[in-house]
Amino acid sequence: MLKSFLSAVLCLLLAVPVAQAAEANPEQLLASLKFQQGKITLPGDIATLDLPANFRYLPPADAGRLLSEGWGNPPGFETLGMIVPAAVNPLSREGWGVVVTYEKQGHVKDDEADSMKYDELLKTMQEAMAEGNAERKKQGYQPMTLVGWAEAPHYDKANHKLYWAKELHGEGDTQNGLNYNIRVLGREGVLVLNAVAGMDQIGQIRNEMKAVTAFSDFTAGNRYADFNERTDKVAEYGIAALIAGGAAAKLGLFGKLFALLLAFKKVIIVGAGAAVMAIGKLFGRKSKVDLTKSP
């Protein structure tokens, strides 16, 4: 069931035409971005980022400009902002960032975390990706392979934070891509932190993401422990669906970001949950550049 659902969603994603992003002067773009430091309250007062000196934050408008004008995505994708390292130019080859979003789809129960069979889940995800390659080719995209876990899923039950990373390979590519994911479970939804980088940066990203999780937290009243079973909605999916890449199949949602790396561009693709609501905002590029890291 999960495999068929994933395959169907992959076909949906690939069937949507996407726009080309406008090119921008890198120096002018970088100078115009309004980086922030210190303690940041995210839009909607849903969560905070207590940034150390080696990280900076871009508010939603500037994050959107970096994603579109700097990294080659069509404009219009809504985020809560981005976290970027202070010492690295985000427009350079070494540049990377963490896209922050929030999914208010209900309180995710973590009862299954201790009993999850992640090897079986990986196999299902690999099979789903392989089945989607026929449609990828049909739409003009290169076939993709989910190589395996770059970091096996693990759940911090005390802090309600889920971590995992996937290694992805695009046919003909010399470098594999890294999709590093963190989900912070909250009262009514999930804070999504997706790192955009290359597989050769796995050691750095793994260390840096430990810091990112340490300074990211929900505000009072929105934390996991604040859940009220009498008044709050429970999500119709659990830990496995978060890792597989989507919300409950019965809801028809996919709701995840796929972090991608192009040769010199970083591209974000939204999942079918957002596609159902705003199908024209799918992120990706088909002919102008080589799509290298997309589930």
Regions found by a protein language model. Name each.
Residues P52, L122, Q126, R206-T213:
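Extracytoplasmic/secreted envelope proteins and their assembly/folding machinery
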Residues S7-P17:
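Bacterial N-terminal signal peptides
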